[in-house]
A protein has these predicted regions:
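Short acidic/glycine-rich loops and adjacent helix/strand connectors
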Residues: 1-174
Length: 174
């Protein structure tokens, strides 16, 4: 009501959309190749109490299928950014940018460091064996890896999780 009063419109014209709904709607409506049936996935640091959502979109109707507040992929990026002595919540793009320079052999070893931190609970990505102090865990486990291989390993881990997410959803449909 306060917003409607402030901008001088009927309250029926004002709608609230949470953080992840805005992300998925933007991704859907900005896509010139959108189809009648679409899956929408959001994974980010945190917004409105969650950091992962999965949506079924059909005929411009958005149905939330699953969500999680334990999908720590963005937290891993933030901690790796800090570990690499860059500014968290600002320089994650630099970590992503270094990933292509990694050697597969070493990046695959880094993936093993992240494996087991998260798991699937149905369609939700949740914590599995995440240590209490993630930074110290990374400090111990990554100390012998080069920066580019750390970035590449984190990127591969993220891609593996997202592909698995899509496979989970496909299995859910069958």
């Amino acid at each position: 009501d306060d917003v409607a009063t402030f901008i001088g419109v009927d309250k029926e014209k004002v709608k609230f959309y949470d953080h992840h709904t805005c992300h998925v709607m933007y991704g859907y409506y900005a896509n010139p190749n959108r189809k009648n049936k679409t899956i929408g996935i959001t994974i980010d640091a945190y917004g409105d109490g969650r950091n992962q959502t999965i949506w079924k979109i059909e005929n411009n109707k958005f149905e939330l299928i699953a969500d999680s507040a334990e999908c720590d992929i963005a937290r891993l990026y933030r901690m790796v950014t800090l570990y690499l002595r860059m500014k968290p919540l600002e320089h994650e793009f630099k970590v992503m940018g270094m990933a292509p320079y990694a050697k597969d052999k070493y990046a695959n070893e880094v993936v093993k460091v992240f494996d087991g931190l998260l798991k699937f609970d149905g369609l939700r990505i949740v914590r599995d064996s995440r240590p209490d102090n993630l930074y110290e865990f990374l400090n111990e486990k990554l100390k012998y890896f080069r920066f580019d291989n750390i970035a590449g390993g984190l990127q591969k881990y993220t891609e593996n999780m997202l592909v698995a997410e899509l496979q989970q959803y496909a299995n859910h449909l069958n």
